[in-house]
UniProtKB/Swiss-Prot annotation:
Gene: trmD
Gene Ontology cellular-component annotations: cytosol
Enzyme class label: transferase
Keyword DNA-binding part of the UniProt annotation: no
Organism: Marinomonas sp. (strain MWYL1)
Reactions catalysed according to its record: guanosine(37) in tRNA + S-adenosyl-L-methionine = N(1)-methylguanosine(37) in tRNA + S-adenosyl-L-homocysteine + H(+)
Subunit structure of this chain's protein: Homodimer.
Taxonomic placement: Bacteria, Pseudomonadati, Pseudomonadota, Gammaproteobacteria, Oceanospirillales
PANTHER family in the cross-refs: TRNA (GUANINE-N(1)-)-METHYLTRANSFERASE
Protein name: tRNA (guanine-N(1)-)-methyltransferase
Length: 250
C-alpha cells in the first residue's frame, strides 16, 4: 500500500512512520509513505500558504494553488489514487470504512490547517472527505495518522498474524472480549478458568459470548445494525438471562 500525505507539518508523522506497527510496516516495505509540503509549491519568497477568507470572519484559509500543485505532484507516482481530505464535515471513520479504504492500493491524504481550505479545491480535487469524530482539532495531521494506522493494520503481513486484525474490536461489528495474561491470580482476582482449560472450542464460545455481552452493555447501538447468526443470538440470550437472574437474586 502506498500513501502520499500533503501536510504543512510532515515531521509530526514520525510518531507513526518510525515507531510501532506502522513503523515496522514501512521498514519492511509493506507500506510506503511519502510527504508533500504545500510550502514547497509556493511562488513567493514568504512561502505563503494561507489567506484571509472572503466575507470576513476569524482565522485564515489554506490557498488553492499550493495545495493543488502538491496534489498534482503526489499524483505523478500514484495517478489513480483517490484524494482524501480529513475534515470534521466528512464521513465518520468506522472499522467498516477502514476495511473499505484498505482495499485501495494507494491514496493521497490532505491534512488541512487554519480554518480549512478553499471550497473550490474540495470541489475540484477531493474525492472523499473523512472525519474521525464530531470534534475540532488544530489540523488534519492527527486524523490522517489515525486513518493511516487503522488502514495499515489491515494490510496482509503487517500484524504478522491476520487473526490479530480479524479479532480486533469492531472487525465483526462487536467490541472485543476481555484479555488476560500472567499472573494467574492478581489481587485475589483469578483468570477465568475456561481460558486455562485448553479446550479451544469452549474458549472460542466464551470469547464470543463476552464480545456480545460487552457490546450489549456498552454499545447496544452496534447490535441494531448487525444480523446475528444463530449461535450469536443464543449466546446473547443466555447472557441476558444470566444477568436478569443475577439481578433478581440480589
Amino acid at each position: 500500500m502506498k500513501v502520499s500525505v500533503i501536510s504543512l507539518f510532515p515531521e509530526m508523522f514520525q510518531a507513526i512512520t518510525q515507531y510501532g506497527v506502522t513503523g515496522r510496516a514501512i521498514k519492511s516495505g509493506l507500506v510506503e509513505v511519502d510527504f508533500f509540503n504545500p510550502r514547497d509549491f509556493t511562488h513567493d519568497r514568504h512561502k505563503t500558504v494561507d489567506d484571509r477568507p472572503y466575507g470576513g470572519g476569524p482565522g485564515m484559509l489554506m490557498k488553492v494553488q499550493p495545495l493543488k500543485d502538491a496534489i498534482a505532484s503526489a499524483k505523478l507516482s500514484v495517478p489513480n489514487a483517490k484524494v482524501i481530505y480529513l475534515s470534521p464535515q466528512g464521513r465518520t471513520l468506522t472499522q467498516e470504512g477502514v476495511q473499505q479504504l484498505a482495499k485501495q492500493a494507494e491514496f493521497i491524504l490532505v491534512a488541512g490547517r487554519y480554518e480549512g481550505v478553499d471550497e473550490r479545491l474540495i470541489q475540484s480535487e477531493i474525492d472523499e472527505e473523512w472525519s474521525i469524530g464530531d470534534f475540532v482539532l488544530s489540523g488534519g495531521e492527527l486524523p490522517a495518522m489515525v486513518l493511516m494506522d487503522a488502514v495499515s493494520r489491515m494490510v496482509p503481513g503487517v500484524l504478522g498474524k491476520q487473526a490479530s486484525a480479524d479479532e480486533d474490536s469492531f472487525s465483526d461489528g462487536l467490541l472485543d472480549c476481555p484479555h488476560y495474561t500472567r499472573p494467574e491470580v492478581l489481587n485475589g482476582e483469578p483468570v477465568p478458568s475456561v481460558l486455562l482449560s485448553g479446550n479451544h472450542e469452549e474458549i472460542r464460545r466464551w470469547r464470543l459470548k463476552q464480545k456480545l455481552a460487552r457490546t450489549f452493555q456498552r454499545r447496544p447501538d452496534l447490535l441494531q445494525n448487525l444480523e446475528l447468526d444463530k449461535e450469536q443470538q443464543l449466546l446473547l440470550e443466555e447472557f441476558i438471562r444470566e444477568t436478569e437472574d443475577s439481578t433478581s437474586a440480589e
